[in-house]
Amino acid sequence: MKKIEFSKGIKIFLASLIVVCIVYALGPKPKLTEDKRLPKLEVSIETIETYIDQRERKVKGLKPDNESEIIWADQAGVKTKYSIVYLHGWSASKQEGAPVHYRLAETFGANLYLPRLYAHGIEKQVPFEELTADKLIQSAKEAIAYGQLLCEELILVSTSTGGSLALYLASE
């Protein structure tokens, strides 16, 4: 059998590759909360809209039309058979899914909750500076919990990053 010999350059490259792989494998790992339970809410269907409006008004630098919003199917404060929660994508807003989510809600006679995901829709010098995966996941969990208050059965609609969040939370 013929012995394969590697040049000095290939040996250095392979050794470097092995070192990089070891450093990567032993390096820091992000700490992600594995608790996928939805938060307990301190609001009722009668007070949810006021609560969300007040919370959004406290956000400094909130861009126009980026606030979380409930669109009632019929009458404010009344549950419907279905509600739709729309989780938007990275750096997007509720308008990313328009007009699809509006038409879906209308077709199903559903209440529609359009949340603003954590740190999104805010005018800042350094956008998303304080955003972490846990904070983003928590805001999606809250959105789902609020949406469940509005209905008997929840329909989750999402795009892009919102889709990743929806799949992650639905996996439990």
What do the PLM-derived regions correspond to, one by one?
Residues V157-A166:
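Gly/Ala-rich beta-loop-alpha elbow adjacent to hydrolase catalytic centers
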Residues I122-L150, I155:
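Catalytic nucleophile-loop/oxyanion-hole region of alpha/beta-hydrolase
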Residues K2-I18:
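N-terminal Sec-pathway targeting helices
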Residues Q95-P99, K135-E142, S164:
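Extracytoplasmic/secreted proteins, especially bacterial periplasmic and envelope-associated proteins
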